[in-house]
């Protein structure tokens, strides 16, 4: 205690008069609390922070102690009043010849049960009105509890229904998952086969494209077509063809007139040979014109 007093004095000198009052209150409170249990105040470091905390704790403890003292005194006063009232009631009953000793045992038992029920219902007396009020309060509480129970039961049923549906859904999903796992191996094999076929088809497609381009080029070279031939060259070729048709038309008309002559093999042969030479010359001229047009386009 001497160390504690020294520490308190040091803190008191450092903080001034207001802290000194707090330190005195803290010292008195600590001493009373530890002496109540037969122990001494332990040594610890007293600082401004610890003094403030202990002061707040002491203030709260004293306030609660005062409140508890007031409540205890009130209970003692009520108990003494109840005892006095019980003594008066006992005197009245004894004067009327209705003391507890003179009453039948069943009456005493009933009175005891009535008192126990009153205590259980937490009512001040055993008047009928008090019992009715208490029973009404219990009925209201019972109704509230039943409503809460019905609501909880409804929510429980809904949750149970959701749980059943979730379990069914989970079972279905597990079944689907197992089926998919069983189908993985054959599907992987089929996918590998499709992949191989796709690669082969891609190679074939490339080959067919190359062959198509090759055949297309060969065909174009055979007919003498080049990408440089424009619409103008084609129109010129068509005009040359019309000119050749005009040139060959008299020959064809002459040949047709020979069809009406009597058959003369020698003359017919000579005429045919002559017309063949003319037709060959016209065809050669057409080829030269076409070739000249192609060469001009290439240049």
Curated annotation (Swiss-Prot):
GO biological process terms held by the UniProt record: cell division; spindle assembly
Entry keyword annotation includes Cytoplasm: yes
Keyword Cell cycle attached: yes
Record keywords: Acetylation, Cell cycle, Cell division, Coiled coil, Cytoplasm, Cytoskeleton, Microtubule, Mitosis
Positions carrying N-acetylserine: 2
Entry-linked InterPro entries: HAUS1
GO cellular component entries: HAUS complex; microtubule; phragmoplast; spindle
Annotated compartments: Cytoplasm, Cytoskeleton, Spindle; Cytoplasm, Cytoskeleton, Phragmoplast
Sections of the chain in a coiled coil: 76-96, 164-184
Reported phenotype of the disruption mutant: Lethal when homozygous.
Quaternary structure annotation from Swiss-Prot or TrEMBL: Part of the augmin complex composed of 8 subunits. The complex acts on microtubules and interacts with gamma-tubulin in spindles and the phragmoplast. Interacts with AUG3.
Reported function: Involved in microtubules reorganization during spindle and phragmoplast development.
Family, per entry: Belongs to the HAUS1 family.
Record's protein name: AUGMIN subunit 1
Native source species: Arabidopsis thaliana (Mouse-ear cress)
Gene: AUG1
């Amino acid at each position: 205690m001497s160390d504690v007093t020294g520490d308190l004095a040091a803190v008191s000198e450092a903080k001034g008069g207001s802290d000194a009052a707090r330190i005195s209150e803290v010292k008195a409170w600590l001493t009373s609390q530890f002496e109540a249990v037969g122990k001494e105040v332990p040594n610890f470091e007293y600082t401004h922070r610890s003094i403030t905390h202990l002061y707040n704790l002491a203030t709260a403890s004293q306030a609660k102690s005062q409140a508890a003292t007031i409540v205890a005194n009130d209970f003692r006063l009520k108990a003494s009043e109840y005892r006095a009232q019980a003594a008066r009631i006992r005197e009245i009953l004894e004067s009327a010849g209705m003391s507890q000793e003179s009453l039948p045992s069943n009456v005493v038992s009933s009175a005891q049960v009535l008192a126990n029920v009153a205590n259980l219902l937490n009512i001040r007396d055993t008047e009928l009105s008090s019992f009715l009020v208490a029973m009404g309060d219990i009925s209201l509480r019972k109704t509230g509890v039943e409503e809460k129970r019905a609501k909880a039961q409804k929510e429980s049923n809904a949750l149970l229904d959701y749980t059943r549906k979730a379990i069914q859904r989970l079972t279905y999903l597990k079944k689907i998952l197992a089926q998919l796992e069983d189908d993985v191996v054959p599907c992987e094999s089929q996918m590998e086969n499709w992949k191989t076929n796709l690669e082969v088809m891609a190679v074939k497609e490339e080959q067919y494209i190359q062959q198509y381009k090759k055949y297309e080029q060969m065909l174009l070279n055979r007919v003498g077509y080049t990408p440089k031939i424009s619409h103008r060259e084609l129109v010129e070729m068509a005009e040359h063809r019309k000119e050749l048709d005009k040139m060959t038309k008299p020959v064809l008309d002459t040949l047709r007139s020979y069809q009406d002559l009597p058959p003369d093999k020698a003359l017919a042969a000579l005429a045919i040979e002559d017309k063949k030479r003319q037709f060959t010359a016209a065809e050669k001229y057409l080829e030269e014109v076409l070739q000249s047009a192609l060469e001009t386009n290439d240049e």
